[in-house]
């Protein structure tokens, strides 16, 4: 198991949102594998507030998670799981509408990158980012740009895992990293609305 699948909790909103998106998406052929993300510490439960550090050690010290902004740790808002599930269901609906517009070549190329265990995490994240940006330009959408790109990133996660279920943990972790880097503030705004 890769070390980058563990979280210090700073990306728990992104993890919850992606997990709920995958659970709500139609045509998700790896549904039975989703609980393995929780059991292996990839997904932190808000109720339990259990997270793993980069060494895979369980952290229960009660520290609140946060996000760096201008070099300062800004606490994340409390996350209401019901709101996250509702937003994820709405995003999954949008993803289902965009699904057929994603060319198999884009997914196949991503699968090949994820299968290459010699590629560093940053390179795979860059490949995911390029795929999302390319799709966002190519797919006509009346969605706001951030929402379209967020949905596309999560949809690509589903499509890669559908094609190669053994990549679920790696693609989940990479997508959470990408979403956390690019859409954290957008997700916070969605949760507050």
Curated annotation (Swiss-Prot):
Gene: BID
Top-level taxon of origin: Eukaryota
Renumbered ranges of motif BH3: 87-101
Keywords annotated in UniProt: Apoptosis, Cytoplasm, Membrane, Mitochondrion, Mitochondrion outer membrane
Protein name according to UniProt: BH3-interacting domain death agonist
Organism: Gallus gallus
Domains: entry comment: Intact BH3 motif is required by BIK, BID, BAK, BAD and BAX for their pro-apoptotic activity and for their interaction with anti-apoptotic members of the Bcl-2 family. Apoptotic members of the Bcl-2 family.
GO cellular component: a single term: mitochondrion
GO biological process: apoptotic mitochondrial changes; hepatocyte apoptotic process; positive regulation of extrinsic apoptotic signaling pathway; positive regulation of intrinsic apoptotic signaling pathway; positive regulation of release of cytochrome c from mitochondria
Coiled coil: none
InterPro entries tied to this protein: Bcl-2-like_sf (IPR036834), BID (IPR010479)
Oligomeric form and interacting partners: Forms heterodimers either with the pro-apoptotic protein BAX or the anti-apoptotic protein Bcl-2.
Pfam families cross-referenced by the UniProt entry: BID (PF06393)
Localization, UniProt: Cytoplasm; Mitochondrion outer membrane
Gene3D superfamilies linked to this entry: Blc2-like
Keyword Mitochondrion: yes
Role, per record: Induces caspases and apoptosis. Counters the protective effect of Bcl-2.
């Amino acid at each position: 198991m890769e070390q980058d699948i563990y979280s210090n909790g700073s990306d728990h909103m992104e993890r919850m949102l992606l997990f709920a998106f995958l659970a709500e998406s139609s045509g998700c052929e790896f549904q039975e594998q989703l609980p393995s993300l929780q059991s292996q510490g990839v997904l932190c439960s808000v109720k339990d507030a259990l997270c793993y550090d980069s060494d895979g050690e369980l952290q229960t010290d009660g520290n609140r998670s946060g996000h760096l902004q201008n070099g300062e740790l800004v606490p994340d808002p409390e996350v209401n799981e019901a709101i996250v599930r509702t937003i994820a269901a709405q995003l999954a609906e949008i993803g289902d509408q965009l699904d057929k517009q994603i060319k198999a070549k884009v997914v196949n190329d991503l699968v090949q990158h994820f299968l290459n265990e010699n590629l560093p995490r940053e390179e795979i994240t860059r490949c995911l980012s390029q795929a999302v940006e390319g799709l966002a330009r190519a797919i006509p959408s009346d969605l706001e740009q951030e929402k379209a790109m967020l949905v596309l990133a999560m949809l690509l996660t589903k499509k890669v895992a559908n094609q190669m279920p053994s990549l679920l943990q790696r693609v989940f972790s990479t997508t959470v990293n990408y979403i956390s880097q690019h859409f954290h503030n957008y997700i916070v705004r969605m949760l507050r609305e």
